[in-house]
């Protein structure tokens, strides 16, 4: 979260680092969930705009990286305390971010969109005797799944009202295919599958992005009406059951 403030020692390694260019930094055309990065601008006392100021954008991204490094070091301190207390082998650790963050992608500096950068959040789960420690998975899951996962890992019955599903199968088999994820913000709703993201708007406008081709840079809704209709049905079905 803003502001991006980390102790200086975590920023120093990035001082002369070469930062990769921002992918698809252009403002998207047509009706989208794009916004003017108002939350970021409220903290911007330098009165510079990272959208058209490359040096400032690079500096902001370095400070973001420093915050990630700071968070990593803080987690290390927590793990050290668990080890010193002798309870690390009886503890489930979950690191989870409640949202992602645009660092200039789609000309947005912040969250509050229905694009991948805002909705894809970090999730790390570790527990004693985990089958494949350190193995990443690309499976699509939802934050609803965290609670039933903790219930299963701690041998607690999952309440009937819980809508999520345990992630234990993905922890045991990281290559396992995920399901779908839905989200909404304001008057927009979205569903994400392995290949597509569909975004619908209250005024009827539709966005469809193909992650096997252009990612979320080209709206292909007009070219794939059958896909739009199928995903619209799946989206509404999920939301109606929520």
Predicted regions mapped to residue ranges:
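Conserved residues at beta->alpha junctions
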Residues: 222
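Active-site-proximal cap/lid insertion segments
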Residues: 1-140, 153-156, 160-161, 214, ...
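C-terminal cap/loop subdomain of S1 sulfatases and analogous C-terminal strand-loop tails that border
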Residues: 99-105, 126, 131-132, 139-147, ...
């Amino acid at each position: 979260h803003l502001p991006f403030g980390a102790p200086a020692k975590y920023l120093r390694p990035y001082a002369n680092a070469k930062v990769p260019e921002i992918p698809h930094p252009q403002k998207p055309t047509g009706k989208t969930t794009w916004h003017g990065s108002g939350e970021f601008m409220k903290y911007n006392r330098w009165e510079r705009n990272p959208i058209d100021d490359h040096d400032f954008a690079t500096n902001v991204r370095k400070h973001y990286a420093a915050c990630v490094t700071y968070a990593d070091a803080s987690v290390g301190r927590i793990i050290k305390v668990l080890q010193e207390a002798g309870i690390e082998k009886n503890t489930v650790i979950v690191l989870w971010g409640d949202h992602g963050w645009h660092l200039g992608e789609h000309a947005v500096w912040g969250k509050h969109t229905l694009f991948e950068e805002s909705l894809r959040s970090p999730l790390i789960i570790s527990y004693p005797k985990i089958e494949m420690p350190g193995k990443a998975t690309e499976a699509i899951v939802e934050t609803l799944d965290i609670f039933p996962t903790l219930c299963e890992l701690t041998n607690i019955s999952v309440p009937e009202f819980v809508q999520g599903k345990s992630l234990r199968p993905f922890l045991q088999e990281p290559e396992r295919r995920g399901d779908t994820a839905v989200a909404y913000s304001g008057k927009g709703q979205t569903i994400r599958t392995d290949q597509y993201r569909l975004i619908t708007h209250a005024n009827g406008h539709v966005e469809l992005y193909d992650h096997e081709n252009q990612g979320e840079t080209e709206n292909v809704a007009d070219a794939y009406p059958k896909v739009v209709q199928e995903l619209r049905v799946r989206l509404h079905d999920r939301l109606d059951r929520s």
